[in-house]
Amino acid sequence: MDKSPQELYQERLKRYEDAQAGRVPDRIPIPLFTVDFHARYAGYTLAETVYDGEKLSHSVEKTVLDFEPDCFEQQHTRNLIGHALDLVGYIPEKWPGGEIGDDDPFQYLDMEIMKGDEYDELINDPSWYFMRRMVPRTARNLRALEKFPNPTAFLYHGIVYNLAAFGTPEMKQAMDLMHEVGKLALSTIEAEKNFIRHMANKGFPAQRGGAMVCPFDAIVDFMRGAKGGMLD
């Protein structure tokens, strides 16, 4: 007797969870983890699945249904980012259809973004450091955030005068841009949630709900660069 999608979903999910928890599964689970195979398999360029949500969904669904893995890596928040990266002018990466060819894979550029003498500044206030240092250095269209005021200065009447930075045309442009990118992000998150539900109804669980970056990766890959991080 053929199993229902719901039965297959629970069977695959248990298999994957058992393996993650160190229990012995009924067999080795096979996840589908791909950055660009789904696009090529479905006959799209990489740029099409980076800029077009419908083509991305179709390519991932076709790949999952044809290969029947035990779980799949969700791709919307990973890949459907072309328009948002264009808007912010993201510097440390090149993506299909943006500065490189439509069928060229993502290229992450090894760069020194955080300076070697800025560790104390980062440690003392990571949130302020990222807003005022990292974001302007990685997003050319958000450089106005270099003037972002330190929230600790918002005490008493400081809340008035330390908002002066937001009165400039450059800061307004940056705020408007962040609103537009935020709307794109919300739309992409919703598309991914809908796709996960859609695939669950077909019997396939998503591989994970989130990810973390270890401290070494955060510093070396995304802040100091390989040379700076290794020398540190």
Place the predicted regions along the sequence by residue.
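Catalytic cores of TIM-barrel enzymes
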Residues: M1-D232
